[in-house]
Regions:
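Active-site-adjacent loop/helix surface patches within enzyme catalytic domains
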Residues: 2-97
Length: 97
């Protein structure tokens, strides 16, 4: 079964610096997927955040950043001796008010 993605182009990404070996799952805490998409694609310097995917409450999958690129979803982070979690992970946002 192939997954169908709704494609978007978030400006909030840069070059991945390491191989992918983690998934990071977040929840949005925003009322609607429309609000979440607007936030994740806002290119204003003070709002620069993104994820590779947003999964809507109805199951639709929005792709915002290509997997070969580094989305900005984990902030300044550290896990099990690894720094720069953004570079080694795929970020998935679950729409959840």
């Amino acid at each position: 079964m192939a997954l169908a993605f709704i494609e978007h182009a978030s400006p909030n990404f840069d070059v991945r610096k390491s191989a992918i070996d983690m998934l990071v799952v977040h929840y949005t805490g925003m009322k609607t997927a429309t609000e979440s998409l607007a936030r994740l694609m806002d290119g204003a310097i003070e709002n620069r955040v993104s994820a590779h995917y947003l999964i809507d409450e109805d199951g639709r999958i929005h792709r915002l950043v290509q997997e070969e690129d580094r989305a900005w979803h984990a902030g300044v982070s550290y896990w099990a001796g690894v720094r720069d979690i953004n570079s080694c992970s795929i970020g998935i946002e679950l729409q959840n008010p």
